A protein has these predicted regions:
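Active-site entrance/lid segments in N-terminal catalytic domains of soluble metabolic enzymes
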Residues: 1-170
Length: 170
């Protein structure tokens, strides 16, 4: 993750007058994105088991005046994320011997890790441990936190609740 990831991509989208998308698993809040970026914005919504979390995220995105809600429908199972398993990727990142060696070979990574803002998942941090300092694999997150029983009725309800442009994202 680049410390300025979503901000930089959003500014590039604005510069080229194109739509910008941000995920529920982004490291920058929808409120900050909305205040920084003046271009059409899409939010990638993950359907969680915790309906309170779903409602809270929906309200934040609506209040931030995003233009499109895209419901992610292909992550209700974690999948075999071989690269993540091989590299030991977790969210938030944790220091291991392997990651320390990577940092040593790329000194700016280490400098940015130590000097830039703390890695957070602002849309989740008040609801699930995966938004805190507890490291988890992305596959584990998808398998345990997302609602594997999501149905067309759930999608229809979200679309109605959103009340604006709505898309399904595979």
């Amino acid at each position: 993750f680049h410390y300025d990831g979503e901000r930089a991509v959003g500014k590039a989208a604005q510069k080229f007058n194109t739509m910008f998308g941000v995920s529920a698993l982004s490291t920058v809040s929808v409120e900050e994105i909305s205040s920084l970026i003046n271009t059409p914005k899409m939010f990638q919504f993950y359907f969680h088991k915790d309906r309170g979390l779903n409602d809270a995220v929906m309200e934040r995105v609506k209040a931030a005046k995003f233009d499109v809600m895209a419901l992610t429908v292909d992550t209700i199972t974690g999948g075999n994320r071989e690269r993540d398993l091989r590299t030991g990727f977790t969210s938030p990142p944790k220091l291991t011997l392997s990651s320390l060696l990577s940092f040593a070979s790329k000194p700016m990574w280490g400098i940015n890790y130590l000097t830039k803002g703390k890695f957070e998942l602002p849309h989740l941090q008040d609801h699930v441990s995966e938004g805190t300092d507890i490291a988890t694999s992305i596959g584990n997150y998808f398998s345990t936190m997302l609602d594997q029983s999501m149905s067309w009725k759930d999608a229809e309800k979200l679309c109605s609740q959103w009340g604006g442009h709505f898309a399904l994202k595979g």
